[in-house]
A protein has these predicted regions:
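Serine/threonine-biased, Pro/acidic-interspersed low-complexity stretches characteristic
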Residues: 1-30, 37-40, 45-128
Length: 128
């Protein structure tokens, strides 16, 4: 993540193939915003998130990063991922009965005075 003038942007390091479409979704109390991105060479970067052009309000947010279902992926990515994304596996791969495997992970964020504390939502509560 990176903060600038109260706005926030996210950067994800992964082995997701280049040109794979990704969706960044930021949610908070009375706040939801999304942006589309495309996986780069081991790094994917979101657009800047703001509160309608203003600095983000203090509070708890979640950032979700996900990959669309098989049917809407580019042909190049479909060949790599396989039918219904059967070739992908890992900690952040979830099976969906309708679309097959999808990539999805979440982190919690506490924003306070332009400072960010990140919480791994995959961790067990006892590990925090």
């Amino acid at each position: 993540w990176k903060m600038n003038d109260g706005k926030i942007r996210f950067q994800v390091s992964s082995n997701i193939p280049e040109e794979t479409p990704l969706m960044f979704t930021l949610r908070g109390k009375e706040y939801t915003a999304q942006c589309k991105s495309v996986a780069g060479n081991r790094i994917s970067i979101s657009e800047w998130f703001s509160d309608r052009g203003n600095p983000m309000k203090n509070g708890f947010y979640t950032i979700d990063v996900s990959c669309p279902i098989y049917s809407v992926l580019p042909e190049k990515i479909k060949k790599i991922f396989g039918e219904r994304n059967r070739n992908i596996c890992g900690q952040y791969v979830k099976f969906e009965p309708v679309g097959g495997n999808t990539i999805h992970f979440s982190y919690g964020l506490v924003l306070k005075n332009s400072k960010v504390q990140v919480i791994d939502m995959q961790q067990r509560i006892s590990a925090l």
